[in-house]
């Protein structure tokens, strides 16, 4: 007789779960007929990750930060953390998209999702031009290495002056950073010594 309440509650639980099981079975049976295109109405809506553009290299952290709108730059070394969305679903790429991106010019920094997004286009193209200028300057430096400027003319002299100024400026910045670190280290040591002597006096 003691088993009657337990048996009754067990039957109650089974019958309460039965309609849900029947509905689930009906959904499973109608799924293949409809092609599985319609999602279940009870499925929760998940936000899709919208990308402003797609970077040609994921090692380009600035591009990744610019293109992926929901990623917040967190100051951890070599780490970008998606923050606040709980890893939303991403749309799958088709083979056409894959071959289209392979066929595009790899010198572009990124590829914009919208053709009307002028800021995105300028971001992707300007960086390409800057990289072209850098490579031209590198080629110019390689060309004038070991050569006297009398052969190359005024342009060579100007480049040498600019390069000399840049090197001096970089050296000055490097030295100021080193001295700032030394001063901070000395201050930390003095503070530590004061703290130790203060603890000993009391």
Curated annotation (Swiss-Prot):
Residues 1-25 form the signal peptide. This is Endothelin-1. The record marks 73-74 as: Cleavage. GO terms for biological process: endothelin receptor signaling pathway; intracellular calcium ion homeostasis; positive regulation of protein localization to nucleus; positive regulation of smooth muscle contraction; regulation of systemic arterial blood pressure by endothelin; regulation of vasoconstriction; vein smooth muscle contraction. Keywords: Cleavage on pair of basic residues, Disulfide bond, Secreted, Signal, Vasoactive, Vasoconstrictor. InterPro entries: Endothelin, Endothelin_toxin_CS, Endothln-like_toxin. It comes from the Eukaryota. The keyword Signal applies. PROSITE patterns: ENDOTHELIN. It comes from Felis catus (Cat). It is found in: Secreted. GO terms for cellular component: extracellular space. Its main location: secreted. Endothelins are endothelium-derived vasoconstrictor peptides. Probable ligand for G-protein coupled receptors EDNRA and EDNRB which activates PTK2B, BCAR1, BCAR3 and, GTPases RAP1 and RHOA cascade in glomerular mesangial cells. Also binds the DEAR/FBXW7-AS1 receptor. Promotes mesenteric arterial wall remodeling via activation of ROCK signaling and subsequent colocalization of NFATC3 with F-actin filaments. NFATC3 then translocates to the nucleus where it subsequently promotes the transcription of the smooth muscle hypertrophy and differentiation marker ACTA2. Belongs to the endothelin/sarafotoxin family. Residues 28-48 are annotated as: Disordered. Residues 110-124 are annotated as: Endothelin-like. Disulfide bonds join 53-67, 55-63. Residues 26-50, 74-202 form a propeptide. One of its GO terms (molecular function) is endothelin A receptor binding. The keyword Disulfide bond applies.
């Amino acid at each position: 007789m003691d088993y009657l309440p337990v048996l009754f509650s067990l039957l109650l639980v089974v019958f309460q779960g039965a309609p849900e099981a029947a509905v689930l079975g009906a959904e499973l049976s109608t799924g293949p007929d409809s092609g599985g295109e319609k999602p279940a109405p009870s499925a929760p809506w998940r936000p899709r990750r919208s990308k402003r553009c797609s970077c040609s290299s994921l090692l380009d952290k600035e591009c990744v930060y610019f293109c992926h709108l929901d990623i917040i730059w967190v100051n951890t070394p070599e780490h970008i953390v998606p923050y606040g969305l709980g890893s939303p679903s991403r749309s799958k790429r088709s083979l056409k998209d894959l071959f289209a991106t392979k066929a595009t010019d790899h010198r572009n920094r990124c590829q914009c999702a919208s053709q009307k997004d002028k800021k995105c286009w300028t971001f992707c193209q300007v960086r390409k031009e800057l990289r072209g200028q850098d490579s031209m300057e590198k080629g110019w430096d390689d060309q004038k290495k070991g050569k006297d400027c009398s052969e190359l003319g005024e342009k060579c002299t100007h480049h040498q002056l600019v390069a000399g100024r840049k090197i001096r400026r970089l050296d000055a910045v490097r030295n100021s950073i080193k001295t700032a670190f030394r001063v901070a280290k000395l201050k930390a040591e003095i503070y530590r010594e004061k703290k130790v002597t203060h603890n000993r006096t009391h």
